[in-house]
Amino acid sequence: MSTITSTNETNFVIDNDEVKGRQIISKRIYQCGELIFQEQPLVLAQFEWNKLYKYYACEYCLYPLESCEQNVRRLCQDSSIIIPHSECDPNRNIDQQIVRCPKCNEMYCSIICYQQAMNNYHLTLCQSNENQNKDQLIRHIIDLWRNVHPPPETTSISLVLKIMAMLKQSNNRLLLLQELQKFSQGVQSENQQFYHKLLRKEFESQVEQLRYALEQFNEQYMQIVEFKWFLTSNGFRQLLALLGRNQQGIGTSSLAIWVKNCEALSIPQQAVAAAVVTSDISQFIDAIYTKIDDISGEFIDCEGSGLFKLQSCCKFY
């Protein structure tokens, strides 16, 4: 049995199926490449190893916080590289645009993102040294996560921390909990069981350490009664399964933005741009990607994951 939920969109509806969970059902035929919808995530977080290795990105929206040249030089470990056609890089003056939290130095791409983060969760999670025990526990939780989830990464424990902080700061916890509850529909389906790799038996002790640390964080600093069940042994496993099943990957790159803008240039402009460094800009781009692959491998982008209310409905069975 399923129920249909109407949306503000005219081209699709949300079907709540008892077995498959939420699904988007189209009301018309779409053409290949056509945009169906756009949405902001309920919450997102950069991967912990990705952040540790200085893939600089906005803490709130994951927009890259390097110029293309800075990005390429870091990935290639070559400070002599000069990127042609700098006007194709919207991040060429990004150093002057970065907004930092005055207390913890966390970076944001704009004052808007900083204010949104503060309003939603950062007021709670800001590691300002005003409460060193709390800051130390947050770092301990993140370190535990890195120990059990090396690259290539698939999710981040910061998603859980942010959800807890959002509940702490929310004026309407019930509404936020209802939104989170929607993501859990179908997680325990007998016909479509999802197993997050952290739920494998060899990770049991590490998962328990994480759960206990988060439980202590809630008891000592959050005091979110409504979240206590998610920090029980069974509840925490369900929470990880919920994230693993519903999250969407997010990747951003100042190099990719520059390449896309270069491809949009007219042929004469491309020739001028390429002449700065090489006779053919496409060859220059290919050479850059080859060098990045040799030095940094597949780890090119600022990467993270997020929970999107609509995109999480787009599953393939």
Would you name each region that the model predicts?
Residues 1-317:
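Short alpha-helical interaction motifs and adjacent low-complexity tails used for partner binding
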